[in-house]
Structures are given as C-alpha cells and as structure tokens.
Regions:
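Terminal targeting signals and extreme-terminal segments of soluble enzymes
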Residues: 1-142
Length: 142
C-alpha cells in the first residue's frame, strides 16, 4: 500500500521502530517552521513480517505501534521534548489480518510537569482491535 502524501515516517529516530515498522503519522502544513504539530493520526499496514502463525498481526507489533503513537502524541512529535514510557496497560480485543490498515488517534488526557497520561485505541476500519492506557515521563532534549 502506498500511503497518502500527507503521511510520513521518521526513519533513524528509533531503530527498534524502524526495524518493526514502518509506522506512519499524518503531517500537517509545515510551511510555518515555528508551528507545533498537533495532528495525531498514526497508521501502518500489516505485512507478513508483522504476523504470527495464524496470519494475524502479532500482539507485540500492536504494542510497539501503540507506543510509537502515544509517545509521539505525548511529546508533540518530539518538537518540544522527548519521553520514555513508564507504564503501559493494554487489552487485545480482536485480531487484524495480513493487509489490514491499523490506525490510532491517541488521546493525551493530562500533562503534568514531568508526566503525560495517554490512552487510545488501535482501529481496523470502524472496529477496535486493541486499547491502551499509558504514562510517559516527559524529558527535555539534551
């Protein structure tokens, strides 16, 4: 599948995500270099390397994709700060098969001085396949 032009990846930022993905996020108009990206739509297409023995996406891949999305949302796409996951709880609700397009729109429920609380669902079409709640530690760039 070729993703629309308004989606991109961030190769080189996280080697583990590069290896497992590619994971995509939707870009916004970046003609204003001072604008902070606030668009939080993420997606990936299930390839054979993402699947278990049942040709369904492996749960670890779903967890990694959710972590990719929630950290980018919590850290405003790493334009202002970075973060690390300190807590992650999830529920597997349905399978997703080879070729499925999985999307996520994480919700940043609260930010404190050092933490962000993020939740979300991974979707295939209109169905939820996975839900999560997470806490991340917000960190300044070095």
């Amino acid at each position: 599948m070729k993703f629309p032009e308004d989606f991109t990846t961030a190769p080189g930022f996280d080697p583990a995500e590069d290896h497992i993905g590619p994971f995509y996020f939707q870009k916004v108009d970046d003609s204003d270099e001072n604008a902070v990206i606030r668009q939080n739509l993420f997606a990936f297409e299930v390839a054979s390397r993402h699947c278990n023995e049942f040709d369904s996406v492996h749960g670890g891949v779903l967890m990694t994709f959710a972590d990719f999305a929630l950290c980018r949302a919590a850290a405003e796409h790493y334009q202002v700060e970075t973060c690390v996951t300190v807590s992650f709880a999830c529920d597997f609700l349905a399978g997703a098969s080879l070729g499925s397009l999985i999307t996520c729109e994480p919700r940043v429920n609260k930010r404190t001085g050092s933490l962000a609380f993020v939740s979300g669902d991974l979707m295939v079409n209109d169905g939820i396949v996975f839900s999560f709640n997470s806490v991340v530690k917000r960190l300044p760039f070095k």
